[in-house]
Amino acid sequence: MALWGGRFSLAADRRFKQFNDSLRFDYRLAEQDIIGSVAWSRALVTVGVLTVQEQQQLVQALTALLEEVRTDPRSILDSDAEDIHSWVEQQLIGRVGDLGKKLHTGRSRNDQVATDLKLWCKDQGEMLRQALIALQQVLTACARQNQDAVMPGYTHLQRAQPITFAHWCMAYVEMLARDESRLDDALRRLNTSPLGSGALAGTAYPIDRDRLADWLGFSAATRNSLDSVSDRDHVLELLSAAAIGMVHLSRFAEDLIFFNSGEAGFIELSERVTSGSSLMPQKKNPDALELIRGKCGRVQGALSGMLMTLKGLPLAYNKDMQEDKEGLFDALDTWLDCLQMATLALDGLAVKRPRCAEAAQQGYANATELADYLVAKGIPFREAHHIVGEAVVAALAQGKPLEALPLEMLQSFSPVIGADIYPLLALDSCLVKRSARGGVAPQQVAQAIDDAQRRLGNIL
C-alpha cells in the first residue's frame, strides 16, 4: 500500500509504478532510514505523540529490523514497496500493528530522505577517507623504499629532467592529501540534520531539532526548512570531490601503465593485478590500472548529470531529486573501489632500477644543468639556453650524451665551459642541486616522506 493513497480513486498504472518506484536503488538507505526513525520516535515522546512504552516497543521492532537489514540488505528487494521509507513502515506495521502508523507523525518523506542521504554520505565518506589515507601510506612506504631509484621525469611525454621514483610517489601523496581535504570539507558542510523540516515549511510539533540532530550524530540542525528539503549541494560537493579524486587516480594509473610498458620498462606489476590474453600467451596486461583509468569517465558523468538535474528546479522538493541517488551511489562506490585497487596495484610492484637509470641518462635530461652552469659563469639565461640547444644538436649528430662530448667541442659553443662541467652533468649531481623545498634532492624527498608519515600517523 502506498503512503499517499487516500487522495486517489484509481490504482497507479503498472508501468508508472515501475517508473516511479525507487526501492531498487534506495534500499541502500535502509540502515539510515531505521536509525533516523529511532531518533524520530524519541522526538515524538518529547511532544507527547508517543508514550515511553510505545516508543520502546517501536525501538525494539526497529532494532530487530536493523539487524535483519545488516545481515541481508538485498532481501528488501523482494518487496513491491515504493521506496525504502514505505518498506520500513510496512515492516514496522507488520510487527507492531497500528502503533507503527504513528511513527510518521510530523515527518515528511522530504525531510526523511534528506536525512537518510546525509547519514549515508557520512558513512560512505568515512570509508573513502580511510581508503585515501591507506593509499597515501602505501605510496609513502613505496617512496621510502625507492629513494635512490633515479628515473626520467617527463614533460610532453618526453624526457625532461631526472627525478626519483620516490619523488614521483610523493607527488601523488600530495594530490591525495588534497582529495582527502576536499572530502573532509564536504563532509563538514553536510553535517547538519534536515529532520524536522517537514515537507518544506517545518514540522507543526515543537520538537527540539538541535537535540534531534545530536541524537543522529550531526553537529547541528539545518537553519531553514525550505532549504533543507530543496537542495542537494552536498551531493554535488561529494561528486565533485570524487570527480577530482578520480582524475588523480586516472593519471596515476596512466603513469604506471606507461612505466610498465615494454617501451619504458621501469616497473613490473604483480601478477595479482594483471591478466593475460586469450590469443597471445606472452601478454601480461595492466587491467587493474586500465579499469581505474576507464572508470574515471563514469564519475565525471555522474557529476555532470546531477548538475543538470538540479539547475532548473524550483523550490522546494521535486521528484527530479529522486535522481540524486543512483549517480551518487555509483560514483562513490567507484571512487572507493578504485582507491582500494590502486593500493593493491602498488603491493608487489617492483622498480627496475638499472633500466630507470639508463633511461634517465638518455634524452639529454641533464641539459638544464649545463644551462645553469653557464648562468653561474655570468651568461644570461636566454643566451645560455640557446648555447645548450646548439650543444644538444651536436651531441645528437654524434650519437653521444652531453657528458661524452670532448671539452674542446663544448668550448666551441662557449669558452667559459671548463672541465669542472663534467661532474655537474652526472645524474646524482642533477638531483642534489634541486635542494629547494619540494625539490628532487635526496634530503628534500626524505623530508617529504618523514612529514607525510608523521601527518598520516596523526590523522588515523
Curated annotation (Swiss-Prot):
Known catalytic reactions: 2-(N(omega)-L-arginino)succinate = fumarate + L-arginine
One GO CC annotation: cytosol
Stored InterPro entries: Arg_succ_lyase_C, Argininosuccinate_lyase, Fumarase/histidase_N, Fumarate_lyase_CS, Fumarate_lyase_fam, Fumarate_lyase_N, L-Aspartase-like
Disulfide bonds: none
Alphabetic keyword roster: Amino-acid biosynthesis, Arginine biosynthesis, Cytoplasm, Lyase
Keyword Coiled coil applies: no
Enzyme Commission number(s) of this protein: 4.3.2.1
Superkingdom of the source species: Bacteria
Family statement drawn from the similarity comment of this UniProt entry: Belongs to the lyase 1 family. Argininosuccinate lyase subfamily.
Entry protein name: Argininosuccinate lyase
Lineage: Bacteria, Pseudomonadati, Pseudomonadota, Gammaproteobacteria, Enterobacterales
